Amino acid sequence: MHDDFLAPGQSLTTVAIDYPHGAEEPGHSHRSCQLIHILSGLVRVTTPAGDWLVPPGRGVWLPARTVHSLKFTGHVRARTLFVDPLARADLPAQCQVVQITPLLRELINASLGIPARFLSGGRDERIIELILDELRIMPILPLNLPDPVDLQLLAVCKEIKQNIAENYELEQVASQLGISGRTLSRRFQRETG
C-alpha cells in the first residue's frame, strides 16, 4: 500500500503530477480515496474489476484500498485528489470514470495551494467542503470494460491487453476458441455488457 499524502485530520489534498508517454505505475492501493483528473494524455486504469480509459477532461474515482495499476499514453498532466474515506458518508463506493464539471475543475485548481492546516471558517475550508459536496454528484461516464467471467474469454482479453499493438481479427480469435465469430461476439457482449 502506497503512503498517502493526507496529514492526520486532513479531509483532502490535491497534488499536480505529470507522467511521460509510456510511464506505468504497478498495482498498488491507498488508504484514502483517489480522484485522478486528467488534463492531457490518456490513462488506462486496471483494477481486479476491470479496465477504465480516462481521456482529458475526465477523472477516475478510486475508493480507498482499491488495488489499481496505471498506464499513461501521451504526455499526461493530472491533478490527483486524495480524500479521507470518512470525509463524507456517501462518497462513491466503486471505481468509475466521471465527468469533471467546470466548477469541480476550478475547485481542484484552487485547492492546489491549500496547506494541511488552515483556518476554520475561511476560504480554504469552504473550497474543501464544496469539493467534498461535488465529489458526491459527479456525472458517471461509461468508459469501463469489465473483465469477462468466462475463463476462455478472460484469457483472450488478457492476451489482447498485453499485446495491444497486435492486429486481432474476430474470426481468428474465435477459431482459436473453437467457435464462430458471431458466437464470440454474443458471449463477449453478454459477459461485458
Stretches with model-predicted labels:
Residues 1-43:
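Generic protein-terminus/edge-of-domain signal
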Residues 31, 47-49, 74-76:
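A generic beta-sheet turn/junction motif
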Residues 32, 40, 75, 105, ...:
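ATP/adenylate-binding site constellation spanning eukaryotic-like Ser/Thr protein kinases
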Residues 49-64:
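Short acidic-glycine-tyrosine-enriched beta hairpin
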Residues 65-95:
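Ligand-binding loop in jelly-roll beta-barrel domains
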Residues 97-165:
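An amphipathic alpha-helical interaction segment
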